[in-house]
Amino acid sequence: MASGILVNVKEEVTCPICLELLTQPLSLDCGHSFCQACLTANHEKSMLDKGESSCPVCRISYQPENIRPNRHVANIVEKLREVKLSPEGQKVDHCARHGEKLLLFCQEDGKVICWLCERSQEHRGHHTFLTEEVAQECQVKLQAALEMLRQKQQEAEELEADIREEKASWKTQIQYDKTNVLADFEQLRDILDWEESNELQNLEKEEEDILKRLTKSETEMVQQTQSVRELISDLEHRLQGSVMELLQGVDGVIKRMENVTLKKPETFPKNRRRVFRAPDLKGMLEVFRELTDVRRYWVDVTVAPNNISCAVISEDMRQVSSPKPQIIYGAQGTRYQTFMNFNYCTGILGSQSITSGKHYWEVDVSKKSAWILGVCAGFQPDATCNIEKNENYQPKYGYWVIGLEEGVKCSAFQDGSFHTPSAPFIVPLSVIICPDRVGVFLDYEACTVSFFNITNHGFLIYKFSHCSFSQPVFPYLNPRKCRVPMTLCSPSS
């Protein structure tokens, strides 16, 4: 009877998590008690998985600040441990029915029994074994099962970690894609806003010009009307006056009448006006996609100083500008400014040697009235060429470049014609907006060099095809006589 009571008491003070006697018991509002260590671990796991804590038994949510130590249960546990350690406590290992030691294990019923139970009708004919033998064999099996479960637990934790990592990776990727989509559409909106602003400015300029001319024409018409009105008044006065007044200077009046010619006002036919057409969104999207695609190959380009170029280079190796003109004193102390040969002397190569792949970079040429940029397959101008006429700037000499002159004339330099092979063939480029920033895309395997007008939303300026890259090529910059620097843009700019 006493052993049964002890069993019931033990069940009441056993932790539902670790199934051992409670250690430093803590109680929740729902009345369930747990070991302090077990409840703490369960709380951390629940917060990580669900974002809130709940009782492991009844699943009722609780607040950590409402947890309280249960000293009454702690005292019961302590007393129970004392009973188990005392001689009286050892009676728990005896049969509750017969009072004999529990030394046998019934295989059929899975119970520990005494020798009198073995002979009873309840266990007659069952297979029984000594508890020590069964315990040893059972311990081996349970130990193996425990190891297997621990391995399964480790695998489960690894799978859990993998899925969390995959979840985080997907979240990061989607967020990155969202950012790119927002940036792309923002850029498209900027393009449309620019087109709208530009079109409105054109209309305002047209309105200002036409109204100005119409106002001038209106003034002339007012003056013309006033002149005719004065002549009519003079004639009416003569007709109403005396004969003397009528005939006095009549020839001059008649001559004035004959010379009256009405000047027609200047008109502006509306049917000849430039008709507004919405931007070619499809074309703009294609240009935008092409620029977005080539920008994936953006490389961080800097210049490589050398003894050949006289260009002035900044400390960060990104800005290139032309040197100051030299002062030469002539006869009788006369001062002359002389520029060195800026066609080639100020040219400089990028530090990156390109032998394969796709490469893209951008150059800031804002506020410059002259520049040359592109790709060069070496920095050795042919001494037989007339450098003043840009004869070296030809693909056959290893230059695939475009340039700007006088702030508005944009050109590409191609190989000379059959009749004038030494002089480059200058290809005038039609650019609606003069570029302040130029993108250069080199596809080594495709043998192409493309130039993009970043200022005008990335529209293609010019493209060299079928380039002969028989050796390493380099980015090329030449600020020419304009002392405003050219700047190699970083990929993050």
Swiss-Prot record:
Record remark: domains: The B box-type zinc finger domain and the coiled-coil domain contribute to the higher and low order multimerization respectively which is essential for restriction activity. The coiled coil domain is important for higher order multimerization by promoting the initial dimerization.
Pathway: Protein modification; protein ubiquitination
Domain B30.2/SPRY: 281-493
Binding residues annotated for Zn(2+), in chain numbering: C95, H98, C117, H123
Zinc finger annotations (RING-type) as residue ranges: 15-59
Catalytic activity: S-ubiquitinyl-[E2 ubiquitin-conjugating enzyme]-L-cysteine + [acceptor protein]-L-lysine = [E2 ubiquitin-conjugating enzyme]-L-cysteine + N(6)-ubiquitinyl-[acceptor protein]-L-lysine
Protein family: Belongs to the TRIM/RBCC family.
Domain of life: Eukaryota
Family matches, as SMART domains: BBOX, RING, SPRY
Residues carrying Phosphoserine: S86
Residue list for modification N-acetylalanine: A2
Signal peptide region: none
Name of the protein in question: Tripartite motif-containing protein 5
Transmembrane helix in keyword set: no
Residue ranges of the region described as Required for interaction with GABARAP and for autophagy: 185-198
Record lineage: Eukaryota, Metazoa, Chordata, Craniata, Vertebrata
